[in-house]
Amino acid sequence: MGMKIVGRERRKLRIRKKVEGTPERPRLSVFRSSKHIYAQVIDDVSGKTLAHASTLSKDLKGSLDEDNKVEAAKKVGALIARICKERQIDKVVFDRNGYLYHGRVSALAQAAREAGLDF
């Protein structure tokens, strides 16, 4: 395992000790791969995913520009916020999953905030 991945796993564990999703305020978790970005809203008490969205979602499939991953992350953030609003989820706890709050991760978070999620 490379040192970047080891460092991210350490940051992830350090963050997860402090961040926990509840039924009233579930956790918005972000996963980033080299091509795609995924977001899911998780209730850690019951261990269930309440909502999910990614660049592979059917709602976004045709509207994404493959060259601009930051714009794709913004669309995923707006989509996850819209899905949460439909399911009466207004407040979440943001889990950046060990990634730096920069680039695609911050773009997703800002778009979700602008679309009405509170965190």
UniProtKB/Swiss-Prot annotation:
Pfam short name (any one): Ribosomal_L18p
One example of a Gene Ontology biological process annotation: translation
A GO MF term: 5S rRNA binding
Highest taxon above the source species: Bacteria
Cellular-component GO terms for this entry: cytosolic large ribosomal subunit
InterPro entries attached to this UniProt entry: Ribosomal_uL18_bac-type, Ribosomal_uL18_bac/euk
Keyword annotations from UniProtKB, A to Z: Ribonucleoprotein, Ribosomal protein, RNA-binding, rRNA-binding
Family indicated by similarity: Belongs to the universal ribosomal protein uL18 family.
Record-linked NCBIfam families: L18_bact
Function: This is one of the proteins that bind and probably mediate the attachment of the 5S RNA into the large ribosomal subunit, where it forms part of the central protuberance.
Complexes and interactors: Part of the 50S ribosomal subunit; part of the 5S rRNA/L5/L18/L25 subcomplex. Contacts the 5S and 23S rRNAs.
Name of protein: Large ribosomal subunit protein uL18
Species the sequence originates in: Sorangium cellulosum (strain So ce56) (Polyangium cellulosum (strain So ce56))
